[in-house]
């Protein structure tokens, strides 16, 4: 067997994509991988379900609702799904990969003082909504508190908001959990 084919087959086996190595639950599937890319929210149940035997997309969403799985940025600028119990150590371990991103966030005016204020507003909001809030609800709360989440440049609409949410994920304040209307709600990390 040629080396590239062996490598490909080894990856398929290691990722739990064959019955012999498939996980028993969504939590096991994600923990076996440490982290699973999750940019496209609608594809997450299928990506996890493909690594489990007989698991429906609804069962994957139940794992998020129970707080077993979270969606966040534990490393670089790519959204990943991790287990809730692995999220914080992964986030801390991979913190060194944030330098370039932090420079860009600072250029958006995201000072430590602003981030701390935004974190407090988010935590206050989540105290009254422990099941989670949508991005729109969080951004609205920030607006009521005088925190501007809009960039001046029309070519960068949403970039400041994204950077602020991402910073609070990377700092371990927020993460995304249960799904409502196709959106992962923001919850207390």
Residue ranges of model-derived segments:
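Short, hydrophobic-biased segments on the C-terminal half of alpha helices
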Residues: 60-61, 162-166
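Extended, solvent-exposed regulatory segments
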Residues: 169-171
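Short, cationic-aromatic polyanion-contact patches
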Residues: 81-87, 180-189
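Beta-hairpin "wing" of winged helix-turn-helix
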Residues: 73, 177-178
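Functionally engaged cysteine thiol sites
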Residues: 152-153, 162
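Phosphate-backbone binding and catalysis cores of DNA-processing enzymes
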Residues: 1-151, 157
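Short beta-strand-centered interaction patches in the first periplasmic/extracellular domains
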Residues: 163-165, 176, 183-186
